[in-house]
Amino acid sequence: MTLNTIALELVPPNADEGRERALEDARKVVQYSAESGLDGRLRHVMIPGIIAEDDDRPITMKPKLDVLDFWSIVKPELPGIHGLCTQVTAFSDEPTLRRRLTDLRAAGMEGVVFVGVPRTMNDGEGSGVAPTDALSIYRELVPNRGVILIPTREGEHGRFNFKCDQGATYGMTQLLYSDAIVGFLSEFAKNTDHRPEILLSFGFVPKMESRVGLINWLIQDPGNQVVADEQEFVKRLAGSEPPQKRQLMVDLYKRVIDGVAELGFPLSIHLEATYGVSGPAFQTFAEMLAYWSPAQRV
């Protein structure tokens, strides 16, 4: 069963802001959805399980509300919207992770992306379950098992193919600021029979990015020219006036959709407002989705 969805990423607030901030975020989603014509179109929220990363992160990472706690607060505010999440596996032993996944499923999480160690560590450094092992171990427990897909990363073809061999049913891309995913999936389709669902991720870039640089930091890959070009595009988006910014994002969206639509992969859309949901972000998302969106299930 594919997710066949438009998913909006909702990051849990800092633990010290708790319930009030969570409710405020959920109500903003309802408000901006109605104002932008996306009411009833969003089918999932995607809640990332956040872990502390590198010290040089532009916005300091504070302890976040747990995914389950956050979901329990926002779910009643978002009727008709289901849950997806990411789960770091690398620091939990098998029984602990099984309990966690059982709780996530019981809370109504329909899909879980298994995530490994942060990029400051090497693959396999965590003491817990590797994401690639989790894909096969929890096959029965989690029907929709996702992995992160970074089309610009060296060696990603082999990595993604192995994850599909292990039981991944979908790949959620890193934020796309170029059409590199088109070449990646075209090549992947030629060399393998795997056709997992692909959640194509698009992120709104507000003016604030020019000052803070969080998106630039999130997508960094030193020495990678394709990523350097993407970072330039992010800077251009951040410095553009709203109409031009919308046009640039819609043009990118069209290039990606046109390039991957006929390759045989089920497609879903994952939308992210990295600095928090806003009216302009929803307006941009609405224009993108007017061009193409996953078919509504009848």
Please give the residue ranges for each predicted region.
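Active-site pocket-lining/capping segments in soluble small-molecule metabolic enzymes
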Residues: 17-39, 113-120, 124-152, 187, ...
